[in-house]
C-alpha cells in the first residue's frame, strides 16, 4: 500500500511540474522574425505576419543585400539604413493596433513588400 501511494505521489508531482513548465513557456513573449531575402529571391519571408500590441518583430538580412525596411506613413518604425551583411538585423516594436505595410526601397519594384497586422 505504501509503495502504491509513493508511486501515485511521484506521478502527481511529474504531472504538476509538467503543467507548471508548459504554462511558464506559454507566458514568454512571442518573438517574430522576418527574413530579408530567401532562396535567392527578393522577398520578405514571411511577407505577412500577425502579432499582438507590444510585441516585436526582428528583421534579419538573409541574402541579396542591400535591404532596408520602410513602413508607409510610419517613419518612426522605418529603418532607412541599408543592411549589407548577412545576419545584420534590427527590431521593431509595435505599440498600437493596426495594419503596417512595409517595403524594401531598393527592391520594392521587384515586389519586396509585406504587411504586419497588430491586434
Q: Which residues does each PLM region occupy?
A:
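Sec-dependent signal peptide recognition
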Residues: 10-18
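Extracytoplasmic copper-binding redox domains, predominantly the cupredoxin/blue-copper superfamily
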Residues: 2-10, 22-119
Amino acid at each position: 500500500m505504501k509503495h502504491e501511494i509513493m508511486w501515485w505521489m511521484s506521478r502527481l508531482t511529474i504531472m504538476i511540474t509538467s503543467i507548471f513548465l508548459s504554462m511558464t513557456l506559454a507566458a514568454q513573449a512571442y518573438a517574430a522574425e522576418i527574413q530579408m531575402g530567401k532562396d535567392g529571391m527578393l522577398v520578405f519571408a514571411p511577407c505577412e505576419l500577425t502579432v499582438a500590441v507590444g510585441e516585436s518583430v526582428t528583421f534579419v538580412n538573409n541574402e541579396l543585400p542591400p535591404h532596408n525596411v520602410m513602413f508607409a506613413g510610419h517613419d518612426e518604425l522605418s529603418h532607412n539604413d541599408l543592411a549589407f551583411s548577412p545576419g545584420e538585423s534590427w527590431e521593431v516594436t509595435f505599440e498600437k493596433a493596426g495594419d503596417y505595410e512595409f517595403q524594401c526601397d531598393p527592391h520594392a519594384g521587384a515586389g519586396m513588400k509585406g504587411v504586419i497586422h497588430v491586434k
